[in-house]
Amino acid sequence: MVNVTRTFFPPINEFVTQIERVYANQWLTNRGALVMELEEKLSRYLELEDSKVILMNNGTIPLQIALKLLGRGGEIITTPFSYVATTAAIVWENCTPIFVDIDPNFLTIDEDKIESAITDKTTCILATHVFGNPCNIERINQIAHKHNLKVIYDAAHCFGVKYKNKSIFEFGDISTCSFHATKLFHTGEGGGLYVKSIELYKESYYSHNFGHNGPQNFDGLGINGKMSEIQAAMGLSVLPHMNFILKSRKNSVDFYDKNLNFSKLEKMKLREGVEWNFSYYPVIFQSESSLLFTLSRLNAVGIYPRRYFFPSLNKLPYVDQIPKINSESISSRILCLPLFFDMELKDLDMIVQIVNS
């Protein structure tokens, strides 16, 4: 069976070594030594210059904290083409998602349509760097500055991505990332919040720790968003293998690029200035019927791509279902092909043959 992705498991002896440290420290959670070590190592690996990272227990909690701090119950301009967590976090935090359609080439929010969606209730722009492809950061920053809005980037897919020689996590007021087991770098389950402002860092920190600033001081409202030492142990075991993981995925991407027939398929256009991370391989069919036919043929031989992202989020039952033509069209026709470390050539070849036929 070939799934759309496969979790990278580090050598078990390396993971056991980290777990033995947890036992030696007799410390399982509450900002332990392994969590703090992983924060430091990630900052170095990602070459963060201005931002600091706070590790959390999953990839959605950072979004919820960002929206609690910056959304303030207002209208959030956002994309309908993302994983459901992006919209769910907005609604969960009692904010209102205002969907802006996407650019059909880059698949990110169409920056030219943002200003017309701004009202006196708008507090924030929440945009997703889809499949690791950056939004038009400069234009979004200009709009936010002009209208005194905050910017949150859902960078769940973006571990290792650089934009104009800087980590993608350096942009926006807050950026968030997922370290779920399906991601390039993972901690089994986990996530990170990246922030430049010292004041906003402090607010984000106490927000993920019940509001604590020290054992007996409370600086504000908080929840339990802390990463455990077991999660950090997995992250510390995976991180040394990132070069191998990226190289392997690039080889698979190169094979797809070289062998797929793009006369009947479209590819996502990467934005100029991006150093991509080979996180997903989406292809866009000419029609939903051709996608479904191809999907059924792949499934018949044990190959399971995913319809990321389907449906378009403006179709969710708990939001105002206002049509978004580009997002709905792309969502119905896009398929992410299997992509993970150490894919076998025979599997890649079979996928290409079926898709091309």
Residue ranges and their predicted role:
Residues 88-90, 143, 230:
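Hydrophobic/aromatic ligand-binding patch that stacks against planar heteroaromatic rings
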Residues 64, 81, 135-136, 160-161, ...:
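Short N-terminal helix/helix-N-cap motif within the alpha/beta-hydrolase-1
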Residues 35-41, 45-54, 112, 124-128, ...:
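PLP-dependent aminotransferase class I/II
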Residues 66-118, 124, 297:
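Conserved PLP-anchoring active-site segment centered on the Schiff-base-forming lysine
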Residues 93, 146-147, 301:
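Helix C-cap/helix->beta junction micro-motif
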